[in-house]
C-alpha cells in the first residue's frame, strides 16, 4: 500500500516525525510485514508511506483502527486532504547484503622494507 501524504506549509518536519513515530509502526500490529517512510528531497512536504500487507482486510483494519483515527485527528490541519492511497502488488525486489560491522576488516597494508 502506498499512502501519499502532503504536509501543510511549515509542518513537514513535525508531520513526518509523527508518521515515523505513530502511524507507520502501528501497521505491524495489524499484520503488515514491513513499512517504509520516504520524504522527497525535491519537495519536503511530499511524504510517501509504504506498507506491506498480505490482505486488503488487514489494511482496512489498520486504516480504520483506533491508532490511525487518533493519528489523523491529532495531526488534522498538518496535512492536505484528500489523502490518496493505492494498493500495489510487488513483482520484484532485491537487496544487496550489507556488511556487518562486527566482521574483522582486512589487514592494513605494511610498507615494504627499505622505503
Where in the sequence are the language-model features?
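Short, well-ordered beta-strand segments in beta-rich or mixed alpha/beta enzyme
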Residues: 1-6, 36-64, 101-102
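Short, surface-exposed ligand-recognition loops at beta-strand->loop->(often short) alpha-helix junctions
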Residues: 6-19
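Enrichment for repetitive, rod-forming helical segments
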Residues: 11-12, 46, 56, 79
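An amphipathic, aromatic/His-enriched active-site/gating alpha helix that lines ligand/cofactor pockets
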Residues: 21-34, 52-87
